């Protein structure tokens, strides 16, 4: 051992301990292991906990030794001695004695931890360190556990097999609250799955308590389990179903359920109706939900019929690009249970480009099966007289429906012949051309026109046959409304639908098919069906939404360097004597035109007792706005408006946040009595008289004005400001008695904007800018509360000044 080390450690000489740092690393490299053994003897002595001198000597020596090991790269040479000292700390108390006060041995362990575990990419060192590191996780010292977890996570990436044998201890540490180690479990799971299987329920139950990072690691683990051992998760299906309501978890949780459904479809069968509701609210999840229905449908013919009816119904709600996936699931079911379609299964593959033909074929087959099952029920249980009457009415309705379908088949027969001829190319691949694109577009239009009639047949049979144990999981109320609408009278308002008229082939007016087609053209209107089926949800949403976000009175789509923006105008409906927007309006530009258009459509629908259709004038206007914003390849207006029933909460919140940024809520507030958004003056008539008194200040006090143009130079000068009438007065001094006045004409103010303290800071602002045609003023209040008061008063005064100017101009004219 080096002489200085022998002196310091042998005599516990604290005065000479600092001299160790004057030695070159190469001088002491050979004796580091010996020094560590001597330190171990000192730290294990009975009086070490009470001897401050020994503790100080040990801390200095450990710091010097670990520094030398790092600088010389000799961790593998001295690793055994270092780990031995590290392990000896486990024999002593490591729990903190007070707040932020570690025990002497906890300090030693902490100093050694980083030196050892920073070498996580060196297998010989990790082979010695990992067994000891895992034991530290159970000592109750959170700081040590956190540091250990961080390094073990890195070790799991570099050499997961070293941690695999300690999977049980790591899992128990996670369950005890050390969630940082969740990232280790996916690395060790393939090598040691059993310990995790034993605790998988407790791990899954932790999900709601985890942060975003922890959730991602746990979901990754569950995904691995579902890939390798899906049956382990079959008992956790109710827990996983509960995660589907969380937007952050839904997609991943559903992916896990898809894998579970492949191995244990019976465990998913009781939750099909829940999955359908989730799919209705989150259309992007329908692909996974369709796979689960296919897996459950393969368990029995009864389940297959129910799954088929649901999958066919999805053809109406999913966009065109998803139809191929749905057809694969349908094909899988019909291949397993050929009796459902009889000999017509091959037609599905032959007509794979004609979705309308597929929907019609499935509807007809399922209808026929439903009729057979109903016939058997009638033989077993003869109806009473009034039931017989009801049955005859049902038979008449079915006969009428068959006539409809037959007429529909005749109507599109020529089109399908054309489609089949187009599809008869000799090669395995078809060349895409402008002609093919046109045919695809016509095919899509035919599908949109046909799906309502075909699906009506499927859904009606789904309700009446009751062949599935879950009632097929469809919204019965909505489906009954579909049936009622089929027999209800059509609005007498004349409409012309150019798109549909152009794509319909000529038919004799005397044929039965023509009479059926002319019955209710709205049945071919995708938007009308969507709004009709979701009217209650839309009204409920709008009743709450209108209290958070106003509906624009006017909207114009304009091009800007950032793309299309919506220029929105809002005015006050009350038009009181002191109204801020009696002759003018509050305008803003939003970069979310699509969202505003959807909100305007929903607001219009919420005021109507009947569903709007594509031919209504207000809808046509919104469609024109949509088309101005539409990019190449984007969804059509009807498709986009029917993707989701109402906007997501985060979208509504983003609009509300934007309105706050442009200070909309300074000038408007929602009135429960009037049921609308009124301007500040009309909402507060008692304040209007005070505000409009000539010469009476609306607000006054001290503000700081920035003296230089550049924002990063913080040089502020205190001024005294007075807001009165049409002017914002300020004096060069701090007192209101100063004579040197400067004036900002409020009618010349272009805008008032907030200066945030930081881009990420979403708190209330302290500073704000006033823009005129010739100058910009940067002002700062003493705190956030005063800043809010000044901002609201200035915005109200500016709006009032501009409204007064507009009235004077109108009077003059």
UniProtKB/Swiss-Prot annotation:
Expression sites by tissue: Expressed at high levels in kidney, and at low levels in eye, brain, gill and heart.
InterPro entries membership: ARM-type_fold, Melted-like, PH-like_dom_sf, PH_domain
Domain PH as annotated: residue spans: 696-799
Compartmental location: Cell membrane
A single Gene Ontology CC term: plasma membrane
Gene Ontology BP term (one): regulation of signal transduction
Disordered: annotated span: 414-445, 484-522
Compositional bias per record (Polar residues), positions renumbered to this chain: 486-511
Domain notes per entry: The PH domain is required for membrane targeting.
Protein name per the record: Ventricular zone-expressed PH domain-containing protein
Taxonomic placement: Eukaryota, Metazoa, Chordata, Craniata, Vertebrata
Gene expressing this chain: veph
């Amino acid at each position: 051992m080096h002489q200085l080390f022998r002196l310091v450690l042998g005599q516990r000489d604290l005065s000479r301990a600092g001299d160790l740092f004057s030695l070159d690393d190469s001088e002491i490299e050979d004796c580091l292991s010996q020094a560590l053994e001597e330190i171990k003897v000192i730290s294990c002595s009975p009086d070490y906990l009470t001897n401050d001198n020994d503790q100080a000597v040990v801390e200095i020596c450990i710091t010097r030794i670990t520094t030398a090991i790092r600088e010389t790269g000799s961790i593998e040479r001295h690793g055994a001695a270092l780990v031995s000292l590290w392990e000896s700390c486990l024999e002593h108390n490591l729990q903190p004695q007070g707040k932020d006060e570690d025990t002497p041995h906890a300090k030693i362990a902490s100093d050694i931890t980083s030196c050892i575990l920073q070498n996580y990419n060196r297998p010989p060192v990790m082979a010695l360190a990992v067994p000891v590191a895992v034991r530290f996780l159970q000592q109750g010292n959170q700081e040590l556990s956190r540091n250990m977890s961080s390094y073990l996570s890195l070790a799991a990436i570099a050499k997961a097999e070293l941690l695999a044998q300690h999977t049980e201890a790591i899992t128990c540490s996670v369950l005890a609250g050390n969630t940082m180690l969740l990232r280790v479990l996916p690395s060790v799971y393939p090598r040691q799955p059993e310990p995790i299987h034993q605790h998988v329920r407790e791990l899954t139950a932790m999900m709601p308590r985890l942060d975003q990072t922890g959730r991602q690691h746990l979901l990754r683990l569950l995904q691995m389990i579902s890939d390798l051992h899906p049956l382990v998760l079959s008992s956790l299906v109710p827990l996983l179903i509960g995660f589907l309501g969380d937007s952050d978890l839904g997609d991943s949780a559903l992916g896990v359920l898809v894998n579970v459904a492949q191995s244990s479809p019976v465990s998913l069968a009781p939750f099909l109706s829940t999955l359908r509701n989730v799919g209705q609210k989150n259309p992007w999840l329908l692909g996974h939900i369709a796979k689960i229905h296919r897996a459950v449908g393969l368990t029995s013919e009864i389940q297959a019929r129910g799954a088929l009816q649901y999958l066919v119904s999805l053809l109406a709600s999913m966009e065109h690009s998803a139809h191929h996936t749905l057809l694969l699931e349908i094909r899988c079911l019909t291949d397993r249970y050929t009796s459902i379609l009889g000999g017509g299964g091959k037609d599905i593959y032959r007509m794979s480009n004609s979705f309308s033909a597929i929907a019609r074929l499935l509807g007809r087959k399922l209808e026929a099966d439903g009729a057979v099952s109903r016939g058997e029920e009638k033989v077993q249980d003869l109806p009473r007289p009034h039931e017989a009457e009801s049955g005859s009415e049902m038979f008449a309705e079915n006969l009428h429906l068959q006539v409809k379908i037959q007429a529909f088949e005749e109507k599109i027969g020529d089109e399908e012949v054309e489609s089949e001829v187009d599809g008869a190319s000799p090669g395995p691949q078809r060349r895409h051309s402008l002609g093919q694109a046109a045919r695809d577009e016509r095919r899509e239009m035919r599908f949109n026109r046909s799906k309502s009639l075909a699906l009506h047949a499927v859904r009606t049979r789904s309700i009446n046959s009751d062949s599935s144990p879950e009632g097929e999981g469809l919204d019965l109320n909505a489906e009954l409304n579909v049936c009622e609408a089929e027999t209800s009278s059509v609005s007498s308002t004349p409409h012309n639908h150019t798109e549909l008229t152009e794509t319909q082939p000529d038919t004799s007016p005397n044929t039965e098919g023509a009479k059926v087609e002319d019955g209710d053209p709205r049945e071919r209107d995708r938007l009308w069906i969507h709004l009709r089926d979701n009217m209650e949800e839309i009204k409920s949403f709008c009743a709450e939404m209108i209290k958070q976000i106003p509906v624009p009175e006017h909207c114009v789509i304009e091009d800007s360097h950032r793309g299309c923006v919506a220029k929105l105008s809002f005015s006050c409906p009350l038009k009181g004597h002191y109204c801020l927007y009696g002759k003018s309006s509050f305008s803003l530009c939003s970069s979310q035109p699509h969202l505003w258009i959807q909100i305007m459509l929903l607001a219009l629908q919420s005021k109507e007792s009947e569903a709007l259709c594509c031919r209504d004038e207000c809808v046509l206007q919104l469609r024109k706005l949509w088309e101005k914003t539409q990019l190449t390849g984007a969804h059509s207006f009807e498709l986009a408006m029917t993707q989701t029933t109402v906007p997501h909460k985060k979208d509504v919140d983003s609009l509300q946040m934007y309105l706050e940024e442009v200070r909309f809520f300074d000038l408007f507030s929602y009135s429960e009595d009037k049921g609308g958004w009124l301007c500040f003056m009309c909402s507060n008539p008692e304040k209007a008289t005070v505000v409009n008194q000539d010469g009476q200040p609306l607000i006054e006090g001290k503000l700081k004005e920035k003296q230089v143009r550049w924002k990063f130079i913080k040089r502020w000068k205190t001024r005294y400001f007075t807001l009165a009438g049409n002017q914002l007065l300020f004096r060069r001094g701090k007192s209101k008695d100063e004579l040197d006045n400067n004036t900002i004409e409020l009618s010349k103010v272009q805008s008032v904007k907030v200066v945030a303290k930081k881009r990420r800071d979403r708190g209330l602002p302290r500073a704000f800018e006033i823009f005129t045609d010739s100058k910009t003023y940067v002002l700062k209040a003493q705190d956030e509360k005063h800043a809010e008061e000044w901002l609201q008063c200035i915005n109200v005064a500016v709006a009032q000044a501009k409204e007064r100017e507009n009235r004077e101009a109108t009077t003059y004219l």
